[in-house]
Amino acid sequence: MTVTADTTATDRVTPAERIAVRCVDSDVHPVPRRGELVDYIPEPWRSKYFRSHRVGEQIFYDAPDYAHSYAMRVDSFPADGEFACSDPDLALKQLIMEAGSDIAILEPIHGEMRIPEATAAFCTATNLWLANHWLDAHNNWHERWRGSICVAIEDPASAVAEIETWAGHP
């Protein structure tokens, strides 16, 4: 018999003891919900560059000859119409509770901009979004998500600053 935890309950309590780590899923790519990322982009880049582009609203080629799920589980798309892996509760249910992973490494995918400083601003926004929407006390109450950071390799100074900012964060 399989028992699945109700992840929508309000009694999200940090576990009293840690589990033994047997299986780590290192291929989890959380995606922001539509419009969620833009508020995290630092100025002046938010107004100057990203307000003229749709940030976090991905448009994919979806012709009948192309797989709708883009190599993702078809059932990983939430019922509200958002993109796959945009719902931490659904990801917890599928990756941890059902698939049996003990820990999941979150690796948000970010796009490269044509201007290195814009890429750095987008990486900063992605890291802040991940911390606030996946690694926060509400969504990581089970302490099984681990974050990774995005850095702009085109801008080494900002990459170092971003690494130093997030050093020690889960």
Walk through the language-model features, giving the residues of each.
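Helix-coil boundary/capping segments in enzymes
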Residues: 1-170
